[in-house]
Amino acid sequence: MPATVARYITPYFARQRISHCCHNCKLAYWPVCSAMRRLSVVSLLVVCGAADVPWLDTSAEAPERTPPAPEVYARKDAGWRKQHATTAHGRPKSLPPSASPLDRLKLEQFRHPTCHSQAHQLGREIFADERKTRASPDAALDAALGVCEYRCTGGCLHGAVGAYAAARGAPPDIAELCARRAMTQIVGAGECAHAVGHALALLQSEEDALRGCAAAPDYSVAHYCAGGVVMETASTFFGRKRDVRAKCERVPPKTRAACYYFGLRSRASGARNRTAAVEETVKDVCTSKKTYKACVYGAATAFLKNKMHTDVGAQGARFCATLGDATWACIDGLMFRTAKFGSEALRRGACAALRGDAAALCRDVAAAGMYSLRKGALVGSYAEV
């Protein structure tokens, strides 16, 4: 029996499926929805198209290992922080110009626990220091990864990978690099692919880097890699006019969602009424049928970009439930950052605001992790017209 059928074989799930399908038709044809309540479960599956739900592939990998939280390094660096804190308020002192990259990295995390982009350059400097005493770029990378660990939410690691690629003078192979023991001890293949995207952007033109990411057979890998490219070239990627829609329509289909994510994630994140702002973004920007789902994914990330509050997560979930076939993309965008930056209460609150398929997918995405390889079907759906 197909898994999609088995999921709805109980009366409870059948009722949830009816409710979800009728909600998507927005009660515009209530007689039809009312009649659907009398359909058999099998007929209902045909009408509502259960196979259209891009469920996560649980055979792909174990859920992504949650990287160390900033609190881990607060404890690990406790002695260093005590030595470098001011006596009045416990805030960090400035470091002398001669301070090592690692000391500056510790200071950055002391100042900003969820730092990231600031640490890219420090990762490059740490690799350069290690390269002076190592026999090869590969050995220097392994050593640099050991120094960076997951400080600044992986920013140092991403920078070290970029410097490694530059030292070799050739684009790294995603599968080969992400299988290195020094890498797998810190992050999984998904976040490693994102780091490779940073490296490709440093070595190649933006177009070639995105094509390199899109060449990955796994949709998730291509998506995360493209995010690294866009992030690395953020200052120039969207141009002076910042026409996000025009730009993201031109990139390879596998990279569209990453393009919209970085193009739209801050557009509505500071609004007082987040739901209204995201809805306005969808109306204004997500007007192309070709890129609609990818655009909705990017717009939805604004709900939880900065202040990741439980009530905002629930608001976002309720908004996602109004989007019909794009509901799945919206849920993925909403939950994308929560595994790394959100709380369990936030995840539970958002998913509890949904019903049926949407609630199940929400819980699966939240549990899988930010850079999970289980989301191939979900991410692949953004590349479809």
Question: What kind of feature is each model-predicted range?
Answer:
Residues Y8, Y12, Q16, H20-H23, ...:
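Low-complexity, intrinsically disordered or signal/transmembrane-proximal segments
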Residues Q16, L45-V46:
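Short, linear, compositionally biased motifs with a strong N-terminal bias
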Residues C21-C25, C33, C48:
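Cysteine-centered motifs
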Residues R37-S43:
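Sec-dependent signal peptide recognition
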Residues V46-P54:
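N-terminal signal peptide
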Residues V53-V385:
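Non-catalytic tandem-repeat scaffold regions and their flanking low-complexity/translocation tails
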